[in-house]
Protein backbone atom coordinates (compact mmCIF):
# COMPACT_ATOMS: atom_id res chain seq x y z
CA UNK A 1 0.00 0.00 0.00
CA UNK A 2 2.83 2.40 0.87
CA UNK A 3 4.45 1.72 -2.50
CA UNK A 4 1.15 2.42 -4.27
CA UNK A 5 0.66 5.73 -2.44
CA UNK A 6 4.23 6.77 -3.21
CA UNK A 7 3.71 5.93 -6.88
CA UNK A 8 0.53 8.01 -6.99
CA UNK A 9 2.30 10.96 -5.36
CA UNK A 10 5.09 10.74 -7.89
CA UNK A 11 2.54 10.63 -10.71
CA UNK A 12 0.80 13.75 -9.40
CA UNK A 13 4.15 15.50 -9.07
CA UNK A 14 5.04 14.67 -12.66
CA UNK A 15 1.81 16.21 -13.91
CA UNK A 16 2.59 19.54 -12.23
CA UNK A 17 6.23 19.93 -13.22
CA UNK A 18 7.89 20.70 -16.51
CA UNK A 19 9.79 17.86 -18.11
CA UNK A 20 11.84 17.04 -21.16
CA UNK A 21 10.12 14.26 -23.06
CA UNK A 22 11.27 12.24 -26.04
CA UNK A 23 9.05 11.84 -29.10
CA UNK A 24 9.67 9.38 -31.96
CA UNK A 25 11.04 11.03 -35.08
CA UNK A 26 10.83 9.47 -38.55
CA UNK A 27 10.67 5.67 -38.76
CA UNK A 28 14.08 4.28 -37.97
CA UNK A 29 15.23 7.56 -36.48
CA UNK A 30 15.93 8.51 -32.91
CA UNK A 31 13.93 10.54 -30.45
CA UNK A 32 13.26 14.26 -30.64
CA UNK A 33 13.37 15.86 -27.20
CA UNK A 34 11.07 18.74 -26.36
CA UNK A 35 10.52 20.72 -23.17
CA UNK A 36 6.93 20.18 -22.06
CA UNK A 37 5.15 22.60 -19.71
CA UNK A 38 2.62 21.27 -17.24
CA UNK A 39 -0.90 22.66 -17.13
CA UNK A 40 -0.23 24.28 -13.75
CA UNK A 41 2.98 25.91 -14.94
CA UNK A 42 1.19 27.25 -17.99
CA UNK A 43 -1.59 28.58 -15.78
CA UNK A 44 0.85 30.59 -13.62
CA UNK A 45 3.45 31.39 -16.28
CA UNK A 46 4.97 34.84 -15.61
CA UNK A 47 2.76 35.32 -12.54
CA UNK A 48 3.65 35.43 -8.84
CA UNK A 49 1.30 33.02 -7.08
CA UNK A 50 -0.13 34.16 -3.76
CA UNK A 51 0.70 31.98 -0.76
CA UNK A 52 -1.65 33.41 1.87
CA UNK A 53 -5.30 34.43 2.00
CA UNK A 54 -4.50 38.14 2.40
CA UNK A 55 -1.62 38.51 -0.04
CA UNK A 56 -3.34 38.82 -3.42
CA UNK A 57 -2.33 42.50 -3.55
CA UNK A 58 1.29 41.72 -2.70
CA UNK A 59 1.46 38.94 -5.30
CA UNK A 60 -0.14 41.13 -7.99
CA UNK A 61 2.28 43.97 -7.24
CA UNK A 62 5.25 41.57 -7.17
CA UNK A 63 4.17 40.27 -10.59
CA UNK A 64 4.29 43.75 -12.13
CA UNK A 65 7.53 44.77 -10.39
CA UNK A 66 9.30 41.55 -11.40
CA UNK A 67 7.92 40.94 -14.88
CA UNK A 68 7.48 44.51 -16.14
CA UNK A 69 10.40 46.18 -14.34
CA UNK A 70 12.83 43.33 -13.70
CA UNK A 71 12.91 43.96 -9.95
CA UNK A 72 14.16 40.84 -8.12
CA UNK A 73 11.22 40.77 -5.68
CA UNK A 74 9.03 37.88 -4.61
CA UNK A 75 5.73 37.94 -2.76
CA UNK A 76 7.34 37.76 0.69
CA UNK A 77 9.63 40.72 -0.01
CA UNK A 78 6.67 42.84 -1.13
CA UNK A 79 4.64 41.79 1.92
CA UNK A 80 7.44 42.87 4.25
CA UNK A 81 7.86 46.13 2.35
CA UNK A 82 4.17 46.98 2.48
CA UNK A 83 3.83 46.05 6.16
CA UNK A 84 6.35 48.79 6.93
CA UNK A 85 3.75 51.29 5.69
CA UNK A 86 0.53 49.57 6.83
CA UNK A 87 -1.42 48.59 9.95
CA UNK A 88 -0.68 44.86 10.51
CA UNK A 89 -4.03 44.24 12.23
CA UNK A 90 -6.00 45.73 9.33
CA UNK A 91 -3.91 43.73 6.89
CA UNK A 92 -4.58 40.53 8.83
CA UNK A 93 -8.35 41.02 8.70
CA UNK A 94 -8.85 42.91 5.43
CA UNK A 95 -5.69 42.43 3.39
CA UNK A 96 -3.62 45.14 1.74
CA UNK A 97 -5.18 48.19 0.09
CA UNK A 98 -4.23 50.22 -2.97
CA UNK A 99 -3.02 52.90 -0.55
CA UNK A 100 -0.59 50.39 0.98
CA UNK A 101 0.65 49.55 -2.52
CA UNK A 102 1.02 53.23 -3.39
CA UNK A 103 3.09 53.96 -0.27
CA UNK A 104 5.35 50.98 -0.93
CA UNK A 105 5.87 51.81 -4.60
CA UNK A 106 6.71 55.42 -3.75
CA UNK A 107 9.18 54.25 -1.07
CA UNK A 108 11.04 52.55 -3.95
CA UNK A 109 11.32 55.84 -5.84
CA UNK A 110 8.60 54.91 -8.32
CA UNK A 111 5.16 56.40 -8.86
CA UNK A 112 1.67 54.97 -8.56
CA UNK A 113 -1.42 56.28 -10.28
CA UNK A 114 -5.06 55.33 -9.95
CA UNK A 115 -7.39 55.94 -12.89
CA UNK A 116 -11.16 55.61 -13.03
CA UNK A 117 -12.12 54.58 -16.54
CA UNK A 118 -15.03 52.97 -18.33
CA UNK A 119 -14.90 49.32 -19.31
CA UNK A 120 -15.16 50.34 -22.96
CA UNK A 121 -11.85 52.23 -22.59
CA UNK A 122 -9.83 49.32 -21.20
CA UNK A 123 -8.47 48.37 -24.61
CA UNK A 124 -6.63 51.72 -24.62
CA UNK A 125 -4.62 50.66 -21.56
CA UNK A 126 -1.14 49.79 -22.87
CA UNK A 127 0.55 48.72 -19.63
CA UNK A 128 -0.27 45.96 -17.13
CA UNK A 129 -2.13 47.31 -14.11
CA UNK A 130 -3.72 46.10 -10.89
CA UNK A 131 -7.49 46.04 -10.51
CA UNK A 132 -9.82 45.09 -7.68
CA UNK A 133 -12.52 42.57 -8.52
CA UNK A 134 -15.31 41.06 -6.49
CA UNK A 135 -15.40 37.33 -7.11
CA UNK A 136 -18.12 35.30 -5.40
CA UNK A 137 -18.48 37.93 -2.71
CA UNK A 138 -14.75 38.34 -2.05
CA UNK A 139 -12.68 41.37 -3.03
CA UNK A 140 -9.56 40.25 -4.85
CA UNK A 141 -6.62 42.02 -6.53
CA UNK A 142 -5.54 40.74 -9.94
CA UNK A 143 -3.25 41.93 -12.73
CA UNK A 144 -5.08 43.33 -15.73
CA UNK A 145 -2.77 42.26 -18.54
CA UNK A 146 -4.57 43.18 -21.71
CA UNK A 147 -7.99 43.86 -23.20
CA UNK A 148 -8.68 42.80 -26.75
CA UNK A 149 -12.08 43.18 -28.34
CA UNK A 150 -14.68 41.62 -26.11
CA UNK A 151 -12.21 39.84 -23.82
CA UNK A 152 -10.18 40.89 -20.78
CA UNK A 153 -7.02 38.91 -19.94
CA UNK A 154 -6.24 38.74 -16.23
CA UNK A 155 -3.36 37.34 -14.19
CA UNK A 156 -5.01 36.06 -11.02
CA UNK A 157 -2.55 35.39 -8.15
CA UNK A 158 -4.81 32.60 -6.87
CA UNK A 159 -6.22 31.08 -10.07
CA UNK A 160 -3.60 31.87 -12.71
CA UNK A 161 -4.32 33.22 -16.17
CA UNK A 162 -8.00 33.91 -16.76
CA UNK A 163 -10.00 35.33 -19.65
CA UNK A 164 -13.28 37.13 -19.02
CA UNK A 165 -15.87 38.49 -21.37
CA UNK A 166 -15.70 42.28 -21.05
CA UNK A 167 -19.29 42.47 -19.83
CA UNK A 168 -18.65 39.81 -17.18
CA UNK A 169 -15.43 41.51 -16.04
CA UNK A 170 -17.17 44.89 -15.72
CA UNK A 171 -19.77 43.44 -13.34
CA UNK A 172 -17.12 42.49 -10.75
CA UNK A 173 -14.69 45.39 -11.26
CA UNK A 174 -14.78 48.65 -9.27
CA UNK A 175 -13.83 50.82 -12.27
CA UNK A 176 -10.32 51.74 -11.08
CA UNK A 177 -6.95 50.69 -12.53
CA UNK A 178 -3.78 51.04 -10.46
CA UNK A 179 -0.66 51.66 -12.55
CA UNK A 180 2.98 51.47 -11.45
CA UNK A 181 5.21 53.96 -13.24
CA UNK A 182 8.96 54.44 -13.24
CA UNK A 183 12.30 53.81 -14.88
CA UNK A 184 13.21 50.41 -16.23
CA UNK A 185 9.83 49.53 -17.71
CA UNK A 186 10.14 46.71 -20.25
CA UNK A 187 7.84 47.49 -23.18
CA UNK A 188 8.06 43.88 -24.32
CA UNK A 189 7.28 42.36 -20.93
CA UNK A 190 5.46 39.01 -20.97
CA UNK A 191 2.42 40.32 -19.11
CA UNK A 192 1.28 42.02 -22.31
CA UNK A 193 1.05 38.70 -24.16
CA UNK A 194 -0.91 36.39 -21.86
CA UNK A 195 -1.46 32.81 -23.01
CA UNK A 196 -4.74 31.92 -24.64
CA UNK A 197 -7.02 29.47 -22.81
CA UNK A 198 -6.05 25.89 -23.61
CA UNK A 199 -9.31 25.37 -25.49
CA UNK A 200 -9.08 28.54 -27.58
CA UNK A 201 -8.13 28.36 -31.23
CA UNK A 202 -7.52 32.03 -31.91
CA UNK A 203 -4.30 33.70 -30.79
CA UNK A 204 -3.74 37.26 -29.64
CA UNK A 205 -2.82 39.78 -32.28
CA UNK A 206 0.90 39.90 -32.92
CA UNK A 207 2.57 42.00 -30.24
CA UNK A 208 3.23 45.59 -31.21
CA UNK A 209 5.78 47.65 -29.25
CA UNK A 210 4.22 50.40 -27.16
CA UNK A 211 5.07 53.92 -28.28
CA UNK A 212 6.43 56.61 -25.93
CA UNK A 213 3.32 58.74 -26.45
CA UNK A 214 1.06 55.89 -25.34
CA UNK A 215 3.07 55.36 -22.15
CA UNK A 216 3.12 59.08 -21.35
CA UNK A 217 -0.68 59.08 -21.38
CA UNK A 218 -0.53 56.98 -18.21
CA UNK A 219 1.99 59.07 -16.27
CA UNK A 220 5.38 58.07 -17.65
CA UNK A 221 7.79 60.94 -18.25
CA UNK A 222 10.60 61.20 -20.80
CA UNK A 223 13.31 60.43 -18.23
CA UNK A 224 11.65 57.06 -17.49
CA UNK A 225 12.75 55.84 -20.92
CA UNK A 226 16.51 56.26 -20.29
From Swiss-Prot:
Top-level class of the enzyme under EC nomenclature: hydrolase
Active site positions, chain numbering: 56
BP GO annotations: amyloid fibril formation; proteolysis
Cellular component, GO, one term: periplasmic space
Main location: periplasm
Gene3D superfamilies the record matches: Cysteine proteinases
Cellular localisation: Periplasm
Residues making up the signal peptide according to the UniProt record: 1-18
Entry keyword set: ATP-binding, Hydrolase, Nucleotide-binding, Periplasm, Protease, Signal, Thiol protease
Coiled coil feature spans: none
Record's keyword annotation contains Signal: yes
Protein name per Swiss-Prot or TrEMBL: Probable functional amyloid protease FapD
Organism of origin: Pseudomonas aeruginosa (strain ATCC 15692 / DSM 22644 / CIP 104116 / JCM 14847 / LMG 12228 / 1C / PRS 101 / PAO1)
High-level lineage: Bacteria, Pseudomonadati, Pseudomonadota, Gammaproteobacteria, Pseudomonadales
